[in-house]
């Protein structure tokens, strides 16, 4: 189910538990003490978080053969994206909601430097 290329679910659950334990072993710093002490604790905490993130990525890639980050979704060019509902409107419970869109030319707001 959740595994890939023969990975067992038990192996996946073990890996997730290990990564969860790593993150739980580094709780956020307490907001007490002087400003400098709080800043130092936050800085050390962020550094440990970065180390945990890299260790988690290493565990995922070596034990499960996966990347820590998902593969980025490839989107079409912005020129091809539209918000026109006339072409392909879904009918999943949204019928009758809102009013039909009327396309109107937008006035040129900053056509000249004078106010009207």
Curated annotation (Swiss-Prot):
Cellular component aspect of the GO annotation: host cell cytoplasm; host cell nucleolus
UniProt biased composition (Basic residues): 36-47
Keyword Transport: yes
Gene Ontology molecular function, alphabetical: DNA-binding transcription factor activity; RNA binding
Subunit structure: Homomultimer; when bound to the RRE. Multimeric assembly is essential for activity and may involve XPO1. Binds to human KPNB1, XPO1, TNPO1, RANBP5 and IPO7. Interacts with the viral Integrase. Interacts with human KHDRBS1. Interacts with human NAP1; this interaction decreases Rev multimerization and stimulates its activity. Interacts with human DEAD-box helicases DDX3 and DDX24; these interactions may serve for viral RNA export to the cytoplasm and packaging, respectively.
Domain notes: The RNA-binding motif binds to the RRE, a 240 bp stem-and-loop structure present in incompletely spliced viral pre-mRNAs. This region also contains the NLS which mediates nuclear localization via KPNB1 binding and, when the N-terminal sequence is present, nucleolar targeting. These overlapping functions prevent Rev bound to RRE from undesirable return to the nucleus. When Rev binds the RRE, the NLS becomes masked while the NES remains accessible. The leucine-rich NES mediates binding to human XPO1.
Designated name of the protein: Protein Rev
Organism per entry: Human immunodeficiency virus type 1 group M subtype B (isolate SC)
């Amino acid at each position: 189910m959740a595994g890939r290329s023969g990975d067992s679910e038990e192996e996946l659950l073990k890996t997730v538990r290990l990564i969860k334990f790593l993150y739980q072993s580094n709780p956020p710093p307490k907001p007490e003490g002087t400003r400098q002490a709080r800043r130092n604790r936050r800085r050390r905490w962020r550094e440990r978080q970065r180390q945990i993130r890299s260790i988690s990525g290493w565990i995922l890639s070596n034990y499960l053969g996966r990347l820590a980050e998902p593969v980025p979704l490839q989107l079409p060019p912005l020129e091809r994206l539209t918000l026109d509902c006339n072409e392909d409107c879904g009918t999943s419970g949204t019928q009758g909601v809102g009013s039909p869109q009327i396309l109107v030319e937008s006035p040129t707001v900053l056509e000249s430097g004078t106010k009207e």
